[in-house]
């Protein structure tokens, strides 16, 4: 589903991206066409009053008009191609939608008709005065007529052969009676499939409506949750166990309700099948009586009725079984309700429970489809039975007329006999499917009973067993030991009877042997032993083993605590010895060795503690072997994953310990160096240097101890202020990154604008040097890219101003948050002074106030720089706007962009207008032969183009 949601989100993004590109392309094209049209209208509106204007119009304006026409044709061709492509894609999309949502196909068709009618009206209005082009004549009329006659020949031959009496074998290879029988059979199958299709469609619609109701309810509840969370500012998360339990309960309840509903439908179907079976039996009796009355022959229907009696008995038995299963389902429903009301949690782990529930859901779904198919089959049986009864009643009314014509009566009776056989086969099919459905119902009810009954309490989760093992009380331990002794005596008596008595071992081995012997006795099913008592004793021994293991674990935890306490005492003694022996430099050199010994002792104790934890986390292999290791691979996989997870945790803790020890060693080395320097200075001093050194060391020790106590006794107020300041510092990093990138863009904008202005100044100098009016249009192709680049830079500058405004607002909000922190610091200091507990001292408040003041100063500096950047960008934007207006006025950029197409005016295919006729008008003159007509055509063409 995530993947589907992700793919839907990506497709939406891609569609919006394409739509944006298409809209930009269309907007650009429309803008270009508008500029070209305005320019061409200016050209056409000019008057050629003088000879110079007419010459300019001929040599300069005429090629521009021709290029405009060519570019307009190209643009129209591109639009037509795009329209063709988009219409094809739209048609494919409509086809896909129609295949996925067939109910909405008429709506699409109506929309298409409306659109086509609109386009048809527009086309008729626009092309009202345009004459219709006649169609091309058929070149090969004889061949077309011959092909048409060949196509019509098979129809004529079929008409002629249809009147003949001979039976013609068609391409299917069947005769007419066989074909009629095949058609009848296929029509009946189609009818059955259509009936099943209607039932499936109705169930699908009902399920779809329920699905949307559930979706609506979920949406309303989610909106209610969001509203409550926003109102109170708190959120509640459901635990995994609670969510799993709720989902399991809902799934089991839904399956149980669906099974009851299907059971009722199946019972109703059984009743209907029994009624139809009785009708078939009555119809057979009527046909038999008619045959014996009019034909005196019962051989047609004289068959053993054992099958019908057996089927009737089976149907009655199935109905009784269905009623019994319905009662069982009601009892199971009551068990489920009591189980869920009592709040009993499922003891199966999540994977096993999910697999069992999935299996039950799949069975219920298959049962639902099978019941719908069975209902459709019974509906078909009812229709055909009613048809047969109608025919029998018609035959009974006309039996007086058919009494004389016995052959016709016999044929009709045979036809009804065939229909009766088909009905009996259909009835037998219904019975077989009913028995098969009953088997599936039994299986589903058994699974539901297992999920709601005893299997829910067979396996216990590991966390629950651990918690129970840790929270054992001493009285329960004593009771468990007494119970273990009683069970051991019973098992010894049983061993004496079977001749398998063994020697006693230590406490744990005796318990293991006792449990194993009890399991062997249960498997071998010895007559002298009751299996129930053996099972009870086994469960008791298992619980005692768990309690004994828990007591061992608690003892090991206490041992680890004592070892850690001894290690800490040893560490304190080492540090005291180091501080006492600081008077001599030679003794100071021995401190690293003591520290290394301390570290090795701590690491050794830590390793012992980790080993003990690993032993505690191991599963109870004795209990698993006693229970037979049914899911051996699953247990091994879980054990492997736990070992791997423990290894990763151990590696992580080891790395953390290494880094911690490295830092501690570095600090201790620094302290040792400092002490050596002090020793050297004190040895050079006066004779009372030893006293001074001891005083300084005591002061240092006091300061170090005070700082350590201060770090250890950090109050909640300090932690809260520290968290707030750290959050602001992290936000500072993100803000500085965005601020630096934005300021880096300013330099690039400066350089690009300067370069563009330099290029524009060069072009202006070239235009001034040429001095002619044609130079402006010649330089337009060079100015156009610069104009486009400046427009892009102008857009980017606007975006930068928006980003700068957002950064400015963020700075204001940060300044307000810093002021709020200052107010909170002063309030906390006043409250601590009033309470006289001094958990938050003035020294701590001054420290935090200093940090906040530094952050406020940095914030003000950044705000000043940002304001300067905004002013600079605004100035650049004004300069760019001014330059763009200047380019539009000087170079008349409203014309066409591509002047490279002017070379097309020299093509041979273009008709040319002579200058004399264009200026002075055309005169009727007799054409004279050219002097160059005697030349070679290629040379004549070159000469013509050169002139």
UniProtKB/Swiss-Prot annotation:
The keyword Coiled coil appears for this protein: yes
Highest taxon in the source lineage: Eukaryota
Region (Disordered): 455-555, 580-620
InterPro entries in the record: NAB, NET2A-D/KIP1-like_C, NET2A-D/KIP1-like_dom
Protein name: Protein NETWORKED 2D
GO terms, molecular function: actin binding
Feature: compositional bias, Polar residues: 525-536
UniProt biased composition (Basic and acidic residues): 474-514, 537-555, 580-589, 610-620
Keywords recorded for this protein, A-Z: Coiled coil
Transmembrane segments: none
Protein source organism: Arabidopsis thaliana (Mouse-ear cress)
Coiled-coil residue windows: 176-205, 247-342, 375-433, 645-684, 744-773
Function: Plant-specific actin binding protein. May be part of a membrane-cytoskeletal adapter complex.
